[in-house]
């Protein structure tokens, strides 16, 4: 199911007929800002527009592996407090790795995907909404095909590296934090006449670096999408020093 179909499912597009009465929501991978707000939004749309029963799966796919399945029945009371303003995910999450090769306590690895599929059916779910990054989406796509499950994926990654997605949940917060870090480094760099280096997350994607670097006034921004050399960086900093600029980021 595509994100366009998700919008239709949750009432943002054309009304469609369907038989879904019970859905689950889980968060997978690393935590980030915006997760609780996303879960809340899904719940209110599913409940208010379609009268669905909504279950929150605890600790990502690990919750579906547990017996009994670890879940929270979501209701209006769940979201009545300050949950919306809290970081992280109140459902819990996991980044233990691939459930097709799940690490066991004895050091071995085991395919536990059938347990996830069985947990889905044990709860009587008509569909599952997964909020996760590229790794989670890749894994859940395989599980959906294996078990013939109805799964919708919502992109969540501070790296913003999910294809065909302009911006993912968590990215904006990550850029704001990195920009604030650069702002804080400016005064120290100026006081000591030094070059300060800020390393940010992103793996093979430079979205955080380029956006925070521009917003925070970085003098040199290195991203994996573009080749660079140490000599090129040194030449740039030397040029700045020759112009009387004695500190840099």
At which residue positions do the language-model features occur?
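A cross-family phosphate/adenosyl-ligand binding-site feature
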Residues: 16-28, 38-124, 135
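Accessory alpha-helical/coil subdomains and C-terminal extensions
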Residues: 119-121, 127-132, 138-142, 147, ...
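A glycine- and small-aliphatic-rich helix-loop capping segment at beta-alpha/alpha-beta transitions
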Residues: 40-48, 70-77, 142-152, 169-173, ...
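Acidic/polar active-site rim loop that often engages polyanionic ligands
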Residues: 154-167, 190-191, 215-216
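Short gly/pro/ser/thr-enriched loop/turn and capping motifs at secondary-structure boundaries
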Residues: 62-64, 98-99, 137, 157-162, ...
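Short, glycine-rich nucleotide/cofactor-binding loops
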Residues: 26-35, 201
């Amino acid at each position: 199911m595509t994100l366009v179909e998700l919008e239709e499912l949750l009432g943002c597009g054309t009304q469609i007929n369907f038989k879904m009465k019970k859905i689950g929501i889980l968060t997978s991978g690393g935590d980030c800002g915006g997760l609780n707000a996303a879960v809340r939004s899904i719940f209110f749309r599913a409940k208010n527009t379609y009268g669905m029963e909504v279950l929150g799966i605890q600790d990502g796919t690990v919750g579906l592996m547990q017996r009994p399945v670890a879940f929270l029945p979501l209701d209006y009371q769940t979201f009545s407090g300050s949950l919306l303003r809290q970081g992280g995910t109140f459902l819990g999450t996991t980044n233990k790795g691939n459930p097709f090769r799940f690490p066991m306590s004895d050091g071995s690895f085991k395919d536990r995907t059938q347990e996830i599929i069985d947990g889905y059916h044990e709860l009587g779910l008509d569909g599952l909404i997964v909020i996760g990054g590229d790794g989670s989406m890749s894994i859940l796509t395989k599980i959906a095909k294996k078990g013939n499950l109805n799964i919708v994926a919502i992109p969540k990654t501070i790296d913003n590296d999910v294809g065909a997605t302009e911006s993912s949940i968590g990215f904006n917060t990550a850029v704001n934090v990195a920009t604030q870090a650069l702002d804080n480094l400016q005064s120290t760099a100026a006081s000591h006449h030094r070059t300060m280096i800020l390393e940010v997350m992103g793996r093979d994607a430079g979205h955080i670096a380029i956006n925070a670097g521009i917003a925070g006034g970085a003098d040199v921004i290195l991203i994996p999408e573009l080749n660079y050399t140490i000599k090129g960086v040194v030449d740039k900093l030397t040029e700045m020093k020759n112009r009387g600029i004695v500190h840099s980021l």
